[in-house]
């Protein structure tokens, strides 16, 4: 499994626009083969930071996501509210289970 997690700086005054774009992207992405989770949220300590968390079956599914039509649409919208470079990492996970 591939996990993607990170953050990007945004103009927090555009929270409604950001939320609408993120929700549209989430709905479309969850329909992709191999997408297990796809979430955006505002950081609780900084209204100018959006956090992203994704779970993918494998690298192939994630690679296909990058060329999906809704990804291009989302990237065009992101330019209207992102204020800097994102910090996003990819992790290969070999095991997943409940926290003990």
What is the meaning of each model-derived region?
Residues 24-36, 55-89:
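An amphipathic, aromatic/His-enriched active-site/gating alpha helix that lines ligand/cofactor pockets
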Residues 16, 53-54, 91-94:
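Intrinsic disorder/low-complexity signal
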Residues 2-9, 39-66:
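Short, well-ordered beta-strand segments in beta-rich or mixed alpha/beta enzyme
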Residues 13, 45-47, 69, 73:
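Short alpha-helical
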Residues 2-40:
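N-terminal first-folded block
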Residues 2, 40-48, 76-100:
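Glycine-rich beta-strand-turn "strand-cap" elements at beta-sheet edges
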Residues 16-18, 48-50, 62, 98-100:
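Short acidic, gly/pro-rich beta-turn/loop elements at beta-sheet edges
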């Amino acid at each position: 499994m591939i996990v993607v997690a990170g953050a990007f700086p945004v103009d927090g005054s555009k929270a409604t626009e950001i939320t609408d774009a993120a929700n549209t992207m989430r709905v479309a992405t969850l329909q992709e083969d191999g997408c297990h989770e796809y979430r955006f949220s505002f950081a609780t300590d900084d209204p100018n930071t959006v956090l992203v968390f994704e779970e993918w079956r494998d690298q192939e599914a994630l690679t296909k996501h990058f060329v999906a039509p809704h990804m291009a649409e989302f990237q065009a919208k992101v330019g209207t509210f992102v204020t800097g470079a994102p910090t996003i990492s990819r992790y290969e996970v070999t095991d997943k289970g409940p926290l003990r």
